[in-house]
Amino acid sequence: MWTYGNPEEREPTGITQGGYSNNIVVDKHFVIKIPESLDLQHAAPLLCAGITTYSPLLKANVKPGDKVGVAGIGGLGHMAIKLAVAKGAQVYAFTTSPKKVEDALSFGAKEAIIVDSLDKLAPYKGKLDYMISTIPAQFDVAAYANVVKPYGSFTQVGMPPGMSLNISAIGLSINRVNFNASLIGGISATRDVVKFCAENKVYPT
């Protein structure tokens, strides 16, 4: 179920109304316990932006010392930076907005690169172990994937208009980078991200 406003035949109104309520009845399988050490205002975003970026990092087995790229520094991107840093990774933030540089560095990124042209990616060619993209628009995927080492992985979580992304097959094949995409995450990983953030004091801002 989407958060809200998504066409859904089962709903009396024809669209989903989301889960923003003081009380709700659900199957216990879907209940996530919030630790007392975690304020609800910090916990709530973890159930969307948090799990959306944590799940790919988990599957990529990001570990201390890994060089991780985060492309797009919005709501998802800032969580990706904080989570990867908390896992001990060296994070390289890529943004087209100069205004996001200070934020990225304050979140713990080792470097923040303003990509006002694709040439700015060239110095990082083949240097990263992994990259997660939160860019919600069409972009040159192969150019960004090129900063990942051969046989490394690139995960797309940003959703462009129309939910479709144009990809250069030859660009990815030349780079030998594994491309995948991810949408939110399962219950087990959601429980993990809540616990991880509580223990490591990773808070959405």
Predicted regions and their residues:
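Glycine-rich phosphate/adenylate-binding loop and adjacent beta-alpha elements
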Residues: 1-31
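A glycine-rich, Thr/Ser-enriched phosphate-binding loop motif common to dinucleotide/cofactor-binding enzymes
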Residues: 14-20, 36-59, 71-79
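Glycine/charged-rich beta-loop-alpha catalytic/anionic-binding loops adjacent to active sites
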Residues: 30-40, 176
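A general structural signal for well-ordered alpha-helical segments in protein cores
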Residues: 31, 50, 128, 141, ...
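Structural detector of well-ordered beta-strand residues that form the stable sheet scaffold
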Residues: 32, 69, 92, 153-155, ...
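Short hydrophobic alpha-helical segments of the AMP-binding
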Residues: 57, 80, 84, 172
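Adenosine-nucleotide cofactor-binding segment
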Residues: 64-73, 83-143
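Glycine-rich phosphate-binding loop and adjacent beta-alpha segment
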Residues: 87, 135-203
